[in-house]
Regions:
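Mid-domain catalytic core of redox enzymes
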Residues: 2, 8, 14, 262-384, ...
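Conserved flavin/dinucleotide-binding core of flavoenzymes
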Residues: 2-18, 118-119, 126, 344-345, ...
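Glycine-rich FAD pyrophosphate-binding loop
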Residues: 40-66
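Active-site/ligand-binding neighborhood in enzyme catalytic cores
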Residues: 125, 144-268, 290
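N-terminal Rossmann-like FAD-binding beta1-loop-alpha1 element of flavoenzymes
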Residues: 20-50
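Dinucleotide-binding Rossmann-like beta1-alpha1 core, especially the glycine-rich loop
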Residues: 67-154
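Short, well-ordered alpha-helices that flank and scaffold nucleotide-derived cofactor binding pockets
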Residues: 37, 41, 63, 251, ...
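Conserved Rossmann-like nucleotide-cofactor binding loop
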Residues: 31, 56, 301
C-alpha cells in the first residue's frame, strides 16, 4: 500500500489563541470524512475536527467478516465512470486494492426463470429494441406499445416529473414495472412513481425536455455517455470491501493531525460572537466546542434538529425530506449443499415490482467479486447478499433478525432454484432510515436548503440528502463544501463573504 505524503499536518487549538482556524465537521460518514480530507489537502493552516455520534466512522459503508469471509454490509461498489470516488481511493493509498467486478451480469426474475437483461438500458429505458425483444422481458403487447412514443405528442416537462409517470406515459407500464423499477429500487429503495426524474436521471431528464420522443432522448443520452466515458468498467470496488475506505480515511486524517472523535454526539449548533458554538456529548455530560467554520454532513433528520433556530426555511424543508429503511442479509452457502455446487450464473438478480417478492435484489457476491470468491471458496462457501425493504414495503422489515434471515433464504432458494439448500451462516444488517427519498421537486428543495444554510457565515452542508445517494455523488458534494470553507475562511478565522 502506498501511503500519501502530501497531506499537511494540523494540530488542534482553541479558536482565539495563536490563531489556527478551527473547522468542525459534524458527521463521520463518507461525506464528512471526504470533506475533512479534501479540506486538509486544500489548507495547511487549519485545525480539523470530525465529530461522529455513533461508535464508529463510515456511516453506511461498513465491512465485517462472516465465517472468516469479509463482505460489505452496505454499498459494495463505487461508480468508476466519474472521478471522485476512484480518486479518493487512490489518494488514501488504496489504489493497489482497486478492483472491478467480473464479467458476470445481473439477471431479471421472470417467474420461473432468471433471464438476462437487455442491452442498452438508460435508467431502465431501452435504446436497443431488438435486444429488448430477444430478451423476452416485455410481453408482445408491451413491445407493441413502445414505438407509439414516436407518434404521440410530446409530453410537456416543466421543473420536474416522476420518472415512473413519465416513462409509463411514453412507453407503457410494462417498461416501468419490468425495467425501470428493478434498477431504481436497488438504488433508491422506492418505486419509480415516487422518484424525481431530474434527481435520479438528470441527463435523461435534460434530453427529454428537448426531444419529442423518450426513446430518442435515451439514445442521445447514451451516446453522450459513451463519448464522455473512456473505455473501462462502470463500477469499481476495493479488495477487502468498500467499508475499508472510511477506516483508512480516519487513519490518514489522524496521521495528518486531524481529530476524529466517535461517540461524540453534537446536540446543539449555535452562532457564537465569532464562529460557532457546539454542545457535544451525552445529555448529562456535555462539553462546548468552538469552531470558526462548520461542515454539516449528517442525515436530514439530524440536520433538522441541529439547524433549529438558525433558519426556519432550512429546518422546515429538511424536515420534509423523508427516509426509507432497508436491510442487507448476507448468506454463506456450503458449495456441497448447492445444486451443481454453485448458485446460478450471473452476478445476481433483480425482481420486477409486479413479482411482489420480499427480496428486491440479490447479489451473487462470489460471482461478482473475485476477491470474495477466493476467500469464500477457500472455506467451501458461496457468498450471496439479499436486499430487502423499500418505501412501500415497511412490513417486511418488522420481522426480527431470525425471521428476516429465514424469509431471505427461502425467497432466494425459490427464485434461484436452490432446492433445499439453506445458508450455513447468515448476517442481517439493518439500515433504519438509511436512504433519503428523492420525490418530484427534490433538486429545488435541496438547493433552497443549501442557500438558506450557506447564507450563514461559516457554514457548509453536504450529505446524501442533497445531490445523490451514490458514494461518488456524496464525495463530490463533500468536496464542494470543503472548497467553500477553504475559499471563505481566512487565516485569521474570519469568514469572507462574496
Amino acid at each position: 500500500m502506498t501511503v500519501p505524503t502530501d497531506v499537511p499536518q494540523t494540530s488542534a487549538t482553541e479558536p482565539g489563541a495563536a490563531r489556527r482556524p478551527h473547522v468542525v465537521v459534524i458527521g463521520g460518514g463518507i461525506s464528512g470524512l471526504a470533506a475533512a480530507w479534501r479540506l486538509a489537502r486544500l489548507r495547511h493552516d487549519l485545525d480539523i475536527t470530525v465529530l461522529e455520534g455513533s461508535p464508529d466512522v463510515g456511516g453506511k459503508l461498513r465491512v465485517s467478516e462472516i465465517e472468516g469471509v469479509a463482505v460489505d454490509e452496505g454499498a459494495e461498489s463505487v461508480l468508476a465512470t466519474r472521478p471522485e470516488a476512484v480518486r479518493l481511493i487512490e489518494e488514501i493509498g488504496l489504489g493497489d486494492d482497486l478492483v472491478h467486478p467480473t464479467a458476470a451480469a445481473p439477471r431479471l426474475f421472470l417467474d420461473p426463470e432468471l433471464v438476462p437483461l437487455p442491452s442498452g438500458l438508460v435508467m431502465g429505458v431501452p435504446t436497443d429494441l431488438a435486444s429488448l425483444a430477444r430478451s423476452g422481458v416485455v410481453s408482445p403487447q408491451g413491445l407493441a406499445r413502445i414505438p407509439l412514443d414516436h407518434v404521440i405528442p410530446q409530453t410537456a416537462i416543466k421543473d420536474d416529473v416522476s420518472i415512473g409517470e413519465y416513462v409509463g406515459r411514453r412507453l407503457g407500464p410494462e417498461v416501468v414495472v419490468r425495467l425501470v423499477a428493478p434498477l431504481l429500487m436497488g438504488v433508491y429503495a422506492d418505486r419509480p412513481i415516487h422518484i424525481s426524474m431530474r434527481a435520479a436521471a438528470p441527463g435523461l431528464f435534460a434530453a427529454a425536455k428537448g426531444e419529442r420522443s423518450l426513446l430518442q432522448a435515451a439514445q442521445s443520452t447514451r451516446a453522450r455517455s459513451n463519448d464522455l466515458v473512456t473505455a473501462g468498467p462502470v463500477f469499481a470496488g476495493v479488495r477487502g470491501g468498500i467499508g475499508r475506505i472510511p477506516q483508512v480515511l480516519r487513519e490518514r486524517l489522524q496521521g495528518a493531525g486531524a481529530v476524529v472523535e466517535t461517540g461524540a454526539t453534537v446536540r446543539t449548533l449555535r452562532r457564537a460572537p465569532r464562529g460557532w458554538r457546539l454542545e457535544v456529548g451525552a445529555a448529562n455530560a456535555t462539553r462546548e466546542v468552538l469552531a470558526d467554520a462548520v461542515i454539516l454532513a449528517v442525515q436530514a433528520p439530524v440536520a433538522t434538529k441541529l439547524v433549529k433556530g438558525l433558519s426556519v426555511q432550512a429546518e422546515t424543508e429538511l424536515s420534509e425530506i423523508e427516509t426509507t429503511s432497508v436491510a442487507v442479509v448476507t448468506m454463506l452457502y456450503r458449495r456441497d449443499d448447492l445444486p451443481g455446487g454453485d448458485v446460478p450464473e450471473g452476478s445476481g438478480y433483480l425482481t420486477p415490482s409486479d413479482a411482489l417478492r420480499p427480496v428486491k435484489a440479490a447479489t451473487f457476491a462470489s460471482h461478482k467479486w473475485q476477491w470474495i470468491d477466493d476467500a469464500a471458496s477457500a472455506r467451501g462457501f458461496v457468498a450471496v447478499r439479499a436486499s430487502m425493504g423499500h418505501a412501500d414495503d415497511v412490513a417486511v422489515l418488522q420481522r426480527d433478525d431470525d425471521e428476516l434471515a429465514r424469509l431471505a433464504a427461502d425467497d432466494v432458494a425459490f427464485v434461484a432454484r436452490l432446492g433445499r439448500a439453506r445458508p450455513a451462516a447468515v448476517r442481517v444488517t439493518r439500515w433504519g432510515g438509511g436512504l433519503p427519498r428523492y420525490p418530484v421537486g427534490h433538486v429545488d428543495r435541496a438547493q433552497r436548503i443549501t442557500e438558506a444554510l450557506e447564507s450563514l457565515p461559516g457554514l457548509a452542508v453536504c450529505g446524501a440528502a442533497f445531490d445523490g445517494v451514490g458514494i461518488a455523488a456524496c464525495i463530490n458534494r463533500a468536496e464542494v463544501a470543503a472548497a467553500r470553507v477553504s475559499q471563505r475562511l481566512g487565516q485569521d478565522g474570519e469568514w469572507r463573504h462574496g
